[in-house]
UniProtKB/Swiss-Prot annotation:
Molecular function, one GO term: ATP binding
Gene3D superfamilies: PurM-like C-terminal domain, PurM-like, N-terminal domain
Name of the protein in its database record: Phosphoribosylformylglycinamidine cyclo-ligase
EC number per UniProt: 6.3.3.1
Amino acid sequence: MSQSGKNGLTYSDAGVDIDAGNLMVEKIKPHVRSTRRPGADGEIGGFGGLFDLKAAGFSDPVLVAANDGVGTKLKIAIDAGKHDTVGIDLVAMCVNDLVVQGAEPLFFLDYFATGKLDPDQGAAIVAGIAAGCREAGCALIGGETAEMPGMYSGGDYDLAGFAVGAAERGQLLPAGNIAEGDVILGLSSSGVHSNGYSLVRKIVSLSGLAWDAPAPFGDGTVADLLMTPTRIYVKPLLKAIRETGAIKALAHITGGGFPENIPRVLPKPLAAEIDLDAIKPPAVFSWLAKTGGVAANEMLRTFNCGVGMIAVVSAGEAEKVAAVLAREGETVFTLGRMVSRSEDAPGTIYKGNLAI
């Protein structure tokens, strides 16, 4: 074992490089500054991040918090050496969970843990986090970088994100007026997003394809297409919420797919009737289903299958809400409707067939 000078071991001898950490902080400062917004204009490096809620323009706010990770999508990033977009995924997974409650994301903090800190790799990850924050309109006000030799092997790392938002009191979602006959709008996903990647990786392994091989489900390599960042729906949804006042509920379609996520925002006497014929799944989902022999029901409870977010609106307001979302860049379609259900019936029922 090496020793540094006559005073014995150093922290660096144990595998923790403080200088590398300081270098990474300098590299990420411009990215952090790029996320400033009303309420947050400080520098990183303090013991805690600051946010001025009054400067954000709220009069009687309720704070909403969420935290999440990116799951084993990170293994593809590590194996493929592509680290510049997982930060966007990290932000998306948190802020999309805020906006479904009607909250505007205000600030974000990240946790980055690795066995051996590479300042350039870390800076690329944080650059992605900053890009996600800018897209969501929230400030990156702090974070933690933990170099933990012995806890993670090789170039492995993990990420966790923490987001806080606010909504005016009385404007939180879901609203209490969801009714039979209400329309369910679907918002298209950008791809697999950040759920189901243990199954994705298993299927890719069975296929024999390398990460840098041309993808059979689109233009680009397998890794590039599977690393497509999770879509951030925040700004279009906030615009629709504020302009129309007609959105009754939103559900972020993440782990558990339709059957686990949609019922979370519905009153117990109602179920979501989903028209599977209305969904146009991206080619990646057909490839996953066919290559892995994954049944349609398993696809629907594992992946978003092309629908990353749903909105519940009254039938008379559906066209107006869809128009605002489309104007803001979303692909929107009628996915289903609200129907009555008995106490022991599932909260999601299907008609038609998923085109995979």
